[in-house]
């Protein structure tokens, strides 16, 4: 019985550490400097072919139905033109 408790504790702490490092690695995708502004290198990467504006799911909040995915911002916009201007 004592051996079983040790194995359970080892598995628990292993999963806990794995979760911590997974969350930490996921956070590395968002690079900011000391004042919270994205670095130019990261913005340049994000502006690549993956950036696009899409129509969000209804209901739209404050008549802002367009959102930028993979670009410089994650905000919502009223028109596709506004979204493209801010996103790219």
Curated annotation (Swiss-Prot):
Species lineage: Eukaryota, Viridiplantae, Streptophyta, Embryophyta, Tracheophyta
Keywords assigned: Developmental protein, Disulfide bond, Signal
InterPro entries linked: Meg
The protein's name in its UniProt record: Protein MATERNALLY EXPRESSED GENE 2
Keyword Metal-binding assigned: no
Tissue spec. comment: Expressed exclusively in endosperm.
Origin: domain of life: Eukaryota
Signal peptide positions on this chain: 1-27
Residue pairs linked by disulfide bridges in the UniProt entry: 65-87
Family from the record: Belongs to the MEG family.
UniProt keyword annotation of Signal present: yes
């Amino acid at each position: 019985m004592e051996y079983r408790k040790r194995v359970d504790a080892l598995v628990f702490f292993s999963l806990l550490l794995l979760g911590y490092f997974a969350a930490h690695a996921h956070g590395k995708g968002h690079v900011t400097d000391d004042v919270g502004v994205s670095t130019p290198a990261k913005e340049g990467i994000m502006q690549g072919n993956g950036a696009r504006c899409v129509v969000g799911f209804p209901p739209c909040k404050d008549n802002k139905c367009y959102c930028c995915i993979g670009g410089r911002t994650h905000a919502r916009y009223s028109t596709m033109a506004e979204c493209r201007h801010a996103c790219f």
